[in-house]
Amino acid sequence: MEKFLWGTATSSHQVEGGNFYNDWWEKLGKIKTKDSSHPACDHYNRYREDFELIKFLNNNSYRFSIEWSRIEKREGEFDEKEIEHYVDMLRELRKLNIEPILTLHHFTIPMWFKEKGGFLNEESPKIFKAFVERVVPYFKDYVKYWITINEPIILAILGYMFGWWPPGEKSFKKSMKVIRNLILSHMETYKVIKTNRKESSVSIAHNMMLFYPYRNFFLDKKVVSYLSNLYNNLFLDALTTGVIKRPFGKNEFYSDLEDSIDFIGVNYYTRIFVRFHPLKIFQERKKKGVVLTDFGYEYYPEGLYEILLNLKRYRKRILITENGIADKEDKLRGDFIKKSIDAIKRAKEKGVDVFGYMYWSLMDNFEWLEGYSMKFGLFEVNFETLERKPRNSAYVYRDMVKSYNF
């Protein structure tokens, strides 16, 4: 019987340090805390030490990403030394009997690709494919589970609709075009991985959110229906049916896109209440009395159960690729983990095939706009000395791994 995957997740830019060739905004001073992502956690140099933290948690898997801009600093020039670094990481994980879950793209892009328009460029799926074709042969012998793209909807919305992330665009039309190109980039990547190793298991890490009507009004309910479909369903629909529906595309069908995921990777954090607004797509409203995380969104781990039940219709296995909480005082995190794992247990009892859980994150790290102010880690990091210390919630998670027999 296949073992349930217990693990944590990180991303290259947030933990490695030394990423000087990508597009992230600290170079323009747009990080709220004015923090720099260097040296971050120095995971690039300390990964062996950090893998011991994974063993401390009794985990048998680890999700991490490679940094495109390290490997291909200039278009078409691939740094073999950097590729070998990630091979070393994979080899070390295998030695420790830790299943690697490898993410090929986690938000950042090389500067040369940014100058070409990034994922707005019609040629971006081909450009990304060229990168993937180069690196996958090095990793294929070590990796069974692949994530092609992390949170494509988040990347498109925050970077191209709201303008909070690079490149700072504020255009619904452009964000939809980016989503379409990310769908096609996934399609090309899926083919490359499967060509290299047929038995590989491939997906995206899909951020999913619960939307509720702020009022018991017809228009609020219509907004909820629209947002749930746009945010949660349409991307997955494209990867299962092969049809890129409006507004992401023009209802066009790609045979290579159909059934181009082997499981569904789910990133779940919270729910939001929304109301109709005549001048906006929606308006978010906070309910009185709800508990908030340090990030400002609602503490609602129970929502994972509803998300998992909603996904049952796809008839795919499910991996929780991220689930976590910013909690500097570590007062809520242990309970959050317990309730999240209980949600998985209840969903499995309803016939949902969940085969793993990755807590976000292994350790405190560089949060995209908030710098080092948001503490997601099971391990606290002193960013002056880079010392790692387990929080109480690390012991909670470790004990949960021991006590649950999925």
Place the predicted regions along the sequence by residue.
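Catalytic domains of carbohydrate-active enzymes, especially glycoside hydrolases
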Residues: 46-67, 259-264
